[in-house]
UniProtKB/Swiss-Prot annotation:
Gene Ontology CC: endoplasmic reticulum membrane; membrane; perinuclear region of cytoplasm; phagophore assembly site membrane; T-tubule
Motif LIR, residue range(s) on this chain: 185-191
Membrane-spanning ranges: 7-23
Extracellular compartment residues: 1-6
CDD domains cross-referenced by the UniProt entry: CBM20_genethonin_1 (cd05813)
Gene3D superfamilies registered for this protein in UniProt: Immunoglobulins
Location of Phosphoserine modifications: S68, S140, S167, S179, S195, S196, S205, S209, S212, S220, S223
This protein's name: Starch-binding domain-containing protein 1
Segments in the Cytoplasmic topological domain: 24-338
Presence of the UniProt keyword Lipid biosynthesis in the record: no
Amino acid sequence: MGAVWSALLVGGGLAGALILWLLRGDSGAPGKDGVAEPPQKGAPPGEAAAPGDGPGGGGSGGLSPEPSDRELVSKAEHLRESNGHLISESKDLGNLPEAQRLQNVGADWVNAREFVPVGKIPDTHSRADSEAARNQSPGSHGGEWRLPKGQETAVKVAGSVAAKLPSSSLLVDRAKAVSQDQAGHEDWEVVSRHSSWGSVGLGGSLEASRLSLNQRMDDSTNSLVGGRGWEVDGKVASLKPQQVSIQFQVHYTTNTDVQFIAVTGDHESLGRWNTYIPLHYCKDGLWSHSVFLPADTVVEWKFVLVENKEVTRWEECSNRFLQTGHEDKVVHGWWGIH
């Protein structure tokens, strides 16, 4: 928008200068109605040509005589003067936008300085750049605009203060860090004092605090021992076998090859008296077989004789009892004898 206004101002100035030059040129030319020009200021009185005085010595119908050399020279000088005036006016009009821009820059800088909040310093780099632009712009235009002496001093003082700001801000940051460290240290001391000594600082005695501390230590020791004991018991329970291997053995000589010895009992692993578990023949009339039974369990059982898949003979004795326990066992019995 500023460029548009500048162009309008320049165009208007040039148009006005052109009109003024045309008006002056018309007024300086000889009259069209036969009016004679006034004599020039530097011309002698005798050399002014009167109207109708031609070289022939008489007027010829009111016609103006031919212009003399002196009149031509004076007209040329007049044209040069008016041309120079036009050029100077155009130069002045061309400098108007630049001067207006410089004035706007100065006004913006003053407004920026007035609107800076209290306790905050504007950016030193931007201030230095604007100051350099101000110093360069007036110099490039022949010193037409400069800061007053008081404002230059204020700018220099502000620049020096801004140059010293980083160190001062660093000192402030260090002071804040030190204060925060001290505050954190004090908080840690307060917490440790209250957690270690209990209510000593709240009206209690030192002996009471010692007793409470010892009691807490005893409680923690007991809980630790209890935890270890439970842990040991858990390990023992996990190491205890869920089943044990019981090997049943008996000496018996069968009469035929279709006969064999078996074992039965009240546990499901022994057939619950309805079925049987066959024993394998080894040698010399020894029959043997291993059965897995639950650990630490009491079962009732007996040897039986099986022929053609049927029980044909039971031991001639009461039921046998077995305590399985937690280890593998070998149960060796004699037929019919406990």
